[in-house]
Amino acid sequence: MDLTNATIITAMVTPFQESGEIDFDKLPQLVDYLLANHTEGVILAGTTGESPTLTHEEELQLFQRIIELIDGRIPIICGVGTNDTRDSVAFVKELATIAGIDAVLAVVPYYNKPNQEGMYQHFKTIAEASELPIILYNVPGRTAACLEVETTLRLAQLEKIVAIKECAGLDAITELIERAPKDFLVYTGEDGLAFATKALGGQGVISVASHVFGSSMYEMYQALEQGNLPEAAKIQRQLLPKMNALFSVPSPAPVKAALNHLGIPVGNLRLPLVACTPEEEQRIIRTLEI
């Protein structure tokens, strides 16, 4: 399944039990809820899924369970990015043997701080080893390294690299939409830029807010596609403070609090992340108006 119909992709949270183990029993309700609210693809074991605290075996178990639950209805994208190229290569080769995975998400190497040629060679090596399509993930606020537009454009020439989740701002998004091959999909990874990215001709958004406001975001994109710019802009303006509230303390604490409040139990977080304080949670829920 390709990504051409996936405009709102949810970077899915990972439910945990009180003991800290993955709560696989909570996944069916979460998946059904996301599908009912217009999620058009899911990313597993990404930033929002708390990938740094998941073991390799846990990730594989999570992927298998979600594959069973989604059953081909929307694309499944699995996080494989590490700051070790050989490790990432081994992971993409392993995932190619699992039926039901549609693409992988590979983040810019973090902590090492490679230069642009190092980033290019990192992703090129992964692409040459992968049987699955690859989405690049540029998030300089977390990795301390930024994939520059020129490097992304070089990578976009490679067969297996099909898209980017771009979190380096609207200038980078705009230039990529203008200059990249037309079949290279540009997603924003920032909910606040969901409207602007789509309006500029991008594919859409890889979203945290879609856990809570997926239906409203879908309506916004429908309005854009129908040429109703004022209505789409109105929805984005109304959503923006709510989107910002979901990042008012380290994510995914706010969105997990929101889901729990909505009756979609996803539990707590794994250290070093911590849950919202009662005061933070009250403020967030009040802003979200849920």
Swiss-Prot record:
One Pfam family recorded for the sequence: DHDPS
A GO term, aspect molecular function: 4-hydroxy-tetrahydrodipicolinate synthase activity
Keywords, sorted A to Z: Amino-acid biosynthesis, Cytoplasm, Diaminopimelate biosynthesis, Lyase, Lysine biosynthesis, Schiff base
Positions of disulphide bridges: none
Active-site annotation: 137, 165
EC numbers, comma separated: 4.3.3.7
Protein purpose: Catalyzes the condensation of (S)-aspartate-beta-semialdehyde [(S)-ASA] and pyruvate to 4-hydroxy-tetrahydrodipicolinate (HTPA).
Name used for this protein in its record: 4-hydroxy-tetrahydrodipicolinate synthase
Organism the protein comes from: Enterococcus faecalis (strain ATCC 700802 / V583)
